């Protein structure tokens, strides 16, 4: 079967915190090119994402997907855990 495209934004990031119940903080890093100095600069954003099974641990690489607002700050859902953190 073919998968349906959801049309929602997805991001790949690293779990920074899992101290809240069913919520993780995911940091997404990207490189931007500075127009004047022609250097690549690392920028990052933090997103709170819903983790229904509390499966994510700090350091895991995850895929998050945009969703309806779940709380005041939570608008993303953890779709898949790509890599488990090496402890």
Swiss-Prot record:
Key words, A-Z: Ribonucleoprotein, Ribosomal protein, RNA-binding, rRNA-binding
One GO MF term: rRNA binding
Record bears the keyword Protein transport: no
One Gene Ontology cellular component: cytosolic small ribosomal subunit
The organism's place on the tree of life at top rank: Bacteria
GO BP terms, alphabetized: translation
UniProt keyword rRNA-binding, yes or no: yes
Known partners and oligomeric status: Part of the 30S ribosomal subunit.
Entries under NCBIfam families matching the protein: PRK05610.1, uS17_bact
Function, as annotated: One of the primary rRNA binding proteins, it binds specifically to the 5'-end of 16S ribosomal RNA.
Protein name (record): Small ribosomal subunit protein uS17
Species, as recorded: Syntrophobacter fumaroxidans (strain DSM 10017 / MPOB)
């Amino acid at each position: 079967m073919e998968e349906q495209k959801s049309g929602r934004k997805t991001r790949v990031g690293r779990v920074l915190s899992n101290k809240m119940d069913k919520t993780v903080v995911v940091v997404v890093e990207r490189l931007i090119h500075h127009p004047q100095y022609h250097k690549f600069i690392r920028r990052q954003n933090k997103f709170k994402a819903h983790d229904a099974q509390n499966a994510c641990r700090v350091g895991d690489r995850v895929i998050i997907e945009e969703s309806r607002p779940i709380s005041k700050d939570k608008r993303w859902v953890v779709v898949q855990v790509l890599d488990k953190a090496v402890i």
